[in-house]
């Protein structure tokens, strides 16, 4: 018998259909961690769709669709999932841009419903009382005053450029804020960073 004689023709009907695998592949390390956690008698918490861990005011870590377990004795939680870095300032800027575009579109078309659908700014303002709106406006005017101070070019004489760059990177601030902070703290980089991160 030759190899050519052994080859049989297979039709599509004879090929078994592979079902789509909807199971999640779990890594070996995660499987070991889950086995250890199962020995701790943790209770699975249902209904949590997002976990947010705050690092600083501007930066947060978000875990979407996590598996959350709670200890039976205390108020401690164990969270499984992939953490993603999320920049709060970028998110806020994107929301402001979207709200501004929605207001501009509403002004051009004269339609209030489009602005309400695109941005929830109107609904948020309608639900606030006048005192909180006034407080928000005062806070916004104070931040505009701080921004105006930043726009004026600060004098960097007597300060090292490397110190200014270090403060800018670590505190995530503008060059003018870094210069003003270094002058306020007598060129002390550590105290300046701590002061600007508050």
UniProtKB/Swiss-Prot annotation:
* PANTHER family attached to this UniProt entry: NASCENT POLYPEPTIDE ASSOCIATED COMPLEX ALPHA SUBUNIT-RELATED (PTHR21713)
- State what protein this is by name: Nascent polypeptide-associated complex subunit alpha
Protein transport is among the record's keywords: yes
One GO MF annotation is: unfolded protein binding
Tell me the lineage of the source organism. Eukaryota, Fungi, Dikarya, Ascomycota, Saccharomycotina
GO CC term, one of those recorded:
nascent polypeptide-associated complex
- List the Gene3D superfamilies hit by this protein, alphabetically: DNA helicase RuvA subunit, C-terminal domain (1.10.8.10), Nascent polypeptide-associated complex domain (2.20.70.30)
Q: Which organism is it from?
A: Yarrowia lipolytica (strain CLIB 122 / E 150) (Yeast)
Sorted keywords for this record are: Cytoplasm, Nucleus, Protein transport, Transport
Tell me where in this chain the UBA domain is found. Answer: 159-198
Q: How does it assemble?
A: Part of the nascent polypeptide-associated complex (NAC), consisting of EGD2 and EGD1. NAC associates with ribosomes via EGD1.
Underlying gene: EGD2
């Amino acid at each position: 018998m030759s190899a050519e004689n052994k080859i049989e023709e297979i039709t599509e009907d004879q090929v078994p259909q592979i079902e789509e695998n909807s199971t999640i592949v779990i890594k070996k390390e995660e499987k070991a961690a889950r086995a250890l956690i199962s020995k701790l008698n943790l209770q699975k918490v249902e209904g949590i769709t997002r976990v947010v861990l705050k690092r600083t005011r501007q930066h947060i870590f978000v875990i979407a669709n996590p598996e959350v377990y709670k200890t039976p004795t205390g108020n401690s939680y164990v969270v499984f999932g992939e953490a993603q870095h999320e920049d709060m300032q970028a998110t806020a800027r994107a929301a402001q841009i979207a709200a501004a575009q929605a207001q501009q579109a509403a002004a051009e078309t004269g339609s209030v419903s489009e602005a309400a659908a695109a941005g929830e700014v109107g609904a948020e303002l309608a639900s606030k009382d006048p005192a909180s709106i006034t407080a928000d406006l005062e806070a916004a005017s104070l931040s505009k005053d701080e921004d105006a101070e930043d726009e004026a070019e600060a004098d960097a004489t007597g300060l090292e450029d490397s110190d200014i760059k270090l403060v800018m990177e670590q505190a995530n601030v503008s060059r003018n804020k870094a210069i003003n902070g270094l002058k306020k703290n007598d060129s002390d980089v550590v105290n300046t960073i701590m002061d600007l991160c508050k």
